[in-house]
Amino acid sequence: MSSSTPTKGRVLVADDDPAILRLVTTILEKEGFAVVGARDGREAYKALQDNSNFTAAVFDVVMPHITGPELLRYMRTEKRFNKIPVMMMTAEQDPKLSSDSFAAGAVVFLPKPFTTTQLQTMLRMLVGKAISQS
């Protein structure tokens, strides 16, 4: 897990693909956010238990141990997490995954592969939603 001094807030990022985790982390840090990275759903769940002070979250849909939608459903049942905006990402081509993600409470869904520009746009939308809720 990585962490830096927050300026705009803290974002939890969970993806089992190290390259995607690094890319999302780098973009968010350049935007002024502190990032807590998790390599799978279990690490993300632990990060949520250890610190409820997140501005936003980005989850891969398909991860070992606990999936992105499972994490999101857990967050929506906990008062301390239920307002945190979440973006879901996946390389899976099943259109049901996006509808399931939105049904679980995601505010943004990004299919992989994506361009850096697409990712930046979606992350700005996500953190903009987080800032407007605070």
Predicted segments, located by residue:
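Receiver (REC) domain active-site loop signature in two-component systems and cognate sites
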Residues: 63
